[in-house]
Amino acid sequence: AKGFAFDLITDHELHHEALDLLSRYKCVVTGTHPEYHTAAMLDALETYRDQGGNLVYLGGNGFYWKIALAPYRDGLVEIRRAEGGIRAWAAEPGEYYNQFDAEYGGLWRRNGRPPQQLVGVGVRAQGDFVGLYYRIKPEVRANPDVNWILDGVEVETIGHEGFSGHGAAGFELDRADKRLGTPENAVILASSEDHPPEAPWVLVPEEQLTH
């Protein structure tokens, strides 16, 4: 509707062409659910960002699982659901290492690269497909470093509509966490609120630590 020209980059292209591909662009926007990445993919995105590229993460539960690609066949992906994490199945002991590259699988967080280090936020909780809105932080409009982002946005809440769950914040929720790598100078523009208590929201397992 706005007439912006864009190119689509697949995960396969990101893995194999890496920074050579990303460096052609001033801005790279992730898809809605960029959950599975190889080390080469993360390296490319991180270097692109550090070299001045504009990396815009507009998804949820991103950069979560470490994967490996088959060296002998395009499109074949391996994932080991090791240790913790929200997962469809649990890998058995002895099955935590990838066959394709012999590296330890599981969460990128367990491999020393939590998503907060790359994009400032990471998944915190999961619930039903009940999506809600975001409320813009009042102090953001008075901050000249970031208030340009809200040029033309006159409302105080955004994200009321969506194809899944009828709102932008639902099912899997991300949050900032300086312990895991969110920069000290990060600015939170908006936060979701009013998630209904009847939706069974739970912390992801890796957040539930005890003695």
Predicted features and spans:
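Aromatic-Pro/Gly-enriched surface loop or interdomain linker
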Residues: 1-24
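Short loop/turn segments at secondary-structure transitions that flank enzyme active sites
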Residues: 5, 12, 34, 61-64, ...
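Conserved beta-strand scaffold positions in the cores of enzyme catalytic domains, especially
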Residues: 6-8, 55, 188
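Short alpha-beta junction capping motif
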Residues: 22-70
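Long, C-terminal catalytic modules of enzymes
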Residues: 65-66, 70-211
